[in-house]
């Protein structure tokens, strides 16, 4: 495959960076060789009510997995995100809110956000919510979502944010599993001009016969449209906060007290309630935010993620606010009502740091220069990518078009379970290789092992594991510690197994190759789907590609590629041959797709991730049970793909 360019550290950035290349090497060595002294110092990024004495008490031994950090210290997350900033920077902007409708935007200062959080914290207390109680949040991307999360943290309640695109069935499952006592929602949400019936979805979820724990629903008025109302259960947000006291002392929380539960998909189809605790999580979210984004006071930072995902928790809310950052919250989507919306928002709010997902980048890339028409984006200094490996072609487009060829890209690898960045460039400390997540963050010890757990030394490829704990690590799966141990620590004894594969090059840089179950075995050759997809989308006419394996009588697996073309391109027999020839040139004959399935839509979750499980089943003809499709943004895509497949000639 053609080698990507290598981009050196820009001199302008090196002059004022928080961490230089030499400092990174020294600090990383200290963080690995003496984690106690390193994290004792760096944990001071937050304020402690009771200072901790013990830094690290962890073991990955399969018999008794135990993860505890700063365990004898106490603190409060909301106080760290708000109260401690008030004296010197209370009138600084905390949140810039940009509505789905570009004419709607507003700002909240740290003082205003603090008052709103205290009021809502008192509302929760008046409803009987206290330390350890679970509150489910099903909210649109409005500042009140952040207020509700911080209010829970202030009084010691555990929030469980449910992404505002999930179905009633998915909501019910999460409420049942967490035994949430109260739900916070809105009448409706807005996204790309469409109304999302949030309150109706909650009503339907609460009608589930096994949902018995919820006795109150607080409803924020977003659109003002008519909704069903149950007077004995439902309360308007504005009525509840009317007259509520705007002072609420923060609860002193143990470092290992739960902060939030966030549900993520499990391989069995049953969602996993990932549990993060207070001290280690906040230390890690704040530290990674500060150094990976090279954040300087006054920078305007925009993470495009929804609060319903871990990226929204760690890098829209908690990490930035703990560092007294200016964080932009966006209700809309990057390419509506025009392809240039994301670039317009950057210019409108003079965004300095932009953090978005490859799926958004590829969608804009397919629009060509329409994505930047009429904008200059000169305020940008650093950009980031999150959610999945970014293919070099999309990286280059993002770098040259959105970033004007001068903004380092931090391609971050991490997971819901890790709490924060694990492998990522530091923009002032590392040269960049498009498509590579670069090197581990402080305290993170990655390794590659083969399928029996034997270490792969030097340059090579294998299963990506982490050999020791880090502060942001999830502590358990809510109510199911056995599943936690089995999922992450039993495959390779004494190591955390990420479920991802990776390649390490001769410089020690890591290249994430995708989920291990996304590795194809074609005639005995192991091929990562990520590598094949990257080569496909490097073709000038291809916007997006998803590659899966399908059974083959001779090869074992054949390569089945779902391909979306750029706007204005149409599939032809000539293009079919052209793409296959391109793949032979880029990777080799072994990586030539056996099937090219042209389609204008792929099955994606509402967070933009491609649901490969469904693509695998369609390719294999195993469509009798596609499993849970409730998280799909457009369930109709599945039927369309099945119809398209009937027109294809398939290999035997």
From Swiss-Prot:
Give the matching NCBIfam families: Ac_CoA_lig_AcsA, PRK00174.1
List ligand-binding residues for CoA: 191-194, 311, 335, 523, 584
Fill in the PTM field for this protein: Acetylated. Deacetylation by the SIR2-homolog deacetylase activates the enzyme.
Residues annotated to bind Mg(2+): 537, 539, 542
User: Would you tell me the protein name for this molecule?
Assistant: Acetyl-coenzyme A synthetase
Q: Where does ATP bind?
A: 387-389, 411-416, 500, 515, 526
List the molecular function annotations (GO) for this entry: acetate-CoA ligase activity; AMP binding; ATP binding; metal ion binding
Query: Where are the N6-acetyllysine modifications?
Result: 609
Query: So what family is this one in?
Result: Belongs to the ATP-dependent AMP-binding enzyme family.
Source organism per entry reads Sodalis glossinidius (strain morsitans)
Keywords assigned: Acetylation, ATP-binding, Ligase, Magnesium, Metal-binding, Nucleotide-binding
One Gene Ontology cellular component annotation?
A: cytosol
| Cofactors, names only | Mg(2+)
Concerning HAMAP family, the annotation shows: Ac_CoA_synth
Q: InterPro entries recorded for this chain?
A: Ac_CoA_lig, ACAS_N, AMP-bd_C, AMP-bd_C_sf, AMP-binding_CS, AMP-dep_synth/lig_dom, ANL_N_sf
**Catalysed reaction equations from the record:** acetate + ATP + CoA = acetyl-CoA + AMP + diphosphate
| Record GO biological process | acetyl-CoA biosynthetic process from acetate; chemotaxis
Enzyme class, top EC level, equals ligase
Name the EC number(s). Answer: 6.2.1.1
* The protein's role, per its UniProt record: Catalyzes the conversion of acetate into acetyl-CoA (AcCoA), an essential intermediate at the junction of anabolic and catabolic pathways. Acs undergoes a two-step reaction. In the first half reaction, Acs combines acetate with ATP to form acetyl-adenylate (AcAMP) intermediate. In the second half reaction, it can then transfer the acetyl group from AcAMP to the sulfhydryl group of CoA, forming the product AcCoA.
């Amino acid at each position: 495959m053609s080698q990507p360019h290598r981009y050196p550290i820009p001199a302008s950035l090196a002059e004022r960076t928080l961490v230089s290349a030499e400092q990174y090497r020294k600090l990383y060595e200290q963080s690995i060789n003496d984690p106690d002294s390193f994290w004792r110092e760096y944990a001071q990024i937050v304020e402690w009510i009771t200072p901790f004495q013990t830094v690290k008490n962890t073991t990955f031994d399969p018999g008794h997995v135990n993860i505890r950090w700063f365990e004898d210290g106490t603190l409060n997350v909301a106080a760290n995100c708000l109260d401690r900033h008030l004296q010197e920077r209370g009138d600084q902007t905390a949140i810039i809110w940009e509505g789905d409708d570009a004419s709607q935007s507003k700002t909240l200062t740290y003082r205003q956000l603090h008052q709103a959080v205290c009021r809502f914290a008192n509302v929760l207390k008046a409803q009987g919510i206290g330390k350890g109680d679970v509150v489910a949040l099903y909210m649109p991307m409005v500042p009140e979502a952040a207020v509700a999360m911080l209010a829970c943290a202030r009084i010691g309640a555990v929030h469980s944010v449910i992404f505002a695109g999930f179905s009633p069935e998915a909501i019910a499952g999460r409420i049942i599993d967490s035994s949430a006592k109260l739900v916070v929602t809105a009448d409706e949400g807005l996204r790309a001009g469409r109304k999302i019936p949030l309150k109706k979805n909650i009503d339907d979820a609460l009608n589930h016969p096994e949902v018995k724990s919820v006795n109150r629903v607080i409803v924020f008025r977003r659109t003002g449209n008519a909704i069903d109302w149950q007077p004995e259960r439902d309360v308007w947000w504005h009525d509840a906060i009317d007259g509520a006291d705007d002072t609420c002392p923060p609860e002193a929380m143990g470092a290992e007290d739960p902060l939030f539960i966030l549900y993520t998909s499990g391989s069995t189809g049953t969602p996993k309630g990932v549990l993060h605790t207070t001290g280690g999580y906040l230390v890690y979210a704040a530290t990674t935010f500060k150094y990976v984004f090279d954040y300087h006071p006054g920078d305007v930072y925009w993470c495009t993620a929804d609060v319903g995902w871990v990226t929204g928790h760690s890098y829209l809310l908690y990490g930035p606010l703990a560092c007294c950052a200016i964080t932009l919250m966006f209700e809309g989507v990057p390419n509506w009502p025009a392809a240039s919306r994301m670039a317009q928002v950057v210019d409108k709010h003079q965004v300095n740091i932009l953090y978005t997902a490859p799926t958004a980048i590829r969608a804009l890339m397919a629009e060509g220069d329409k994505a930047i028409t009429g904008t200059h984006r000169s305020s940008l200094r650093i950009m980031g990518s999150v959610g999945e490996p970014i293919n070099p072609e999309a990286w280059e487009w993002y770098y040259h078009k959105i970033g004007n060829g001068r903004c380092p890209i931090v391609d971050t690898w991490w997971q819901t379970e890790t709490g924060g960045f694990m492998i990522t460039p530091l923009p002032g400390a590392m040269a960049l290789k498009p498509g590579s997540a670069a090197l581990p963050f402080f305290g993170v010890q990655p390794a590659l092992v083969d399928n029996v757990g034997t270490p792969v030394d030097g340059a090579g490829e294998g299963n990506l594991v982490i050999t020791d704990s880090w502060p942001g690590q999830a502590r358990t799966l809510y109510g199911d510690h056995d599943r936690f141990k089995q999922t992450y620590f039993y495959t390779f004894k004494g190591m955390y197994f990420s479920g991802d594969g990776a390649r390490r090059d001769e410089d020690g840089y890591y290249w994430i190759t995708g989920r291990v179950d996304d590795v194809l075995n074609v005639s005995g050759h192991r091929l990562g789907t990520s590598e094949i997809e990257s080569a496909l989308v490097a073709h000038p006419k291809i916007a997006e590609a998803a590659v899966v394996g399908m059974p083959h009588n001779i090869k074992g697996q054949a390569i089945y590629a779902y391909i979306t073309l750029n706007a204005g391109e149409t599939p032809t027999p000539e293009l079919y041959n052209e793409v296959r020839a391109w793949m032979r040139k880029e990777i080799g004959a072994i990586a030539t797709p056996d099937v090219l399935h042209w389609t204008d839509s792929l099955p994606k979750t509402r967070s933009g991730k491609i649901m490969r499980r469904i693509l695998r089943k369609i390719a294999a003809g195993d469509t009798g049970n596609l499993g849970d499709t409730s998280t799909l943004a457009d369930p109709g895509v599945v039927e369309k793909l099945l119809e398209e497949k009937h027109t294809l000639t398939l290999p035997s």
